[in-house]
Amino acid sequence: MWPNSILVLTVLLISSTLVTGGGVKGAEKGVCPPDNVRCIRGEDPQCHNDNDCKDQKICCYWHCGFKCVQPVKDSWEQ
């Protein structure tokens, strides 16, 4: 019972981190903004990495696909 509880807790913690989008780095430009959109199907990617983006934007999973978006300040860094 104990190992199963640890596994469930670990999975919940990881998935909550992925859903909020926190901590996804975009070089030194900032981090990806939170994306709470639930998708039925994904869109074709508009970028594959930050080098594909212009105007200080970064490549993030945003609204069902990878897109160049304006980064936000990382609230964990002071």
UniProtKB/Swiss-Prot annotation:
This is WAP four-disulfide core domain protein 12. InterPro entries: Elafin-like_sf, WAP_dom. Pfam families: WAP. It comes from the Eukaryota. GO terms for cellular component: extracellular space. Antibacterial protein. Putative acid-stable proteinase inhibitor. Its main location: secreted. Residues 1-21 form the signal peptide. Residues 25-72 form the WAP domain. GO terms for biological process: antibacterial humoral response; defense response to bacterium; innate immune response.
